[in-house]
Amino acid sequence: MKEFKNKLLSIGCIDNEYLQKYLYLIAANAKTAKEKYKTNCHHILPRCYFKLLNLPVDNSKTNLVNLSHKDHLLAHYYLYLCATGKFKLLNSLAFRYIETKYQLPIEEIIKNLDNYQQLCIDAKK
């Protein structure tokens, strides 16, 4: 996790409680199996990290983790809360999409993560 943390810090993440929560969430799900309709594959170092550095996206198993829909949203929320500059802007675009899709502010969705999890499962079936 230290390597991931250092790379995230190098593109403008702040070492705050949300970065720690993000890294903990990733570590806690390291062995989560892919489950049809119930999980999302998440890039630990986000795709925008590589785009900001003009590098090819790392799709290796070491940079991927399976997360429930609610944990996936939380992961991006935590990244947003520790990001700065272009990295923060790129993360905020994902939230605008989710807010538009469910017609709720992201804060309301975060408060009701269990409902979000079920909405995602239902939408994929």
Model-derived regions: residue spans:
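Surface-exposed polar/charged interaction patches
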Residues: 11-14, 25-29, 85, 101, ...
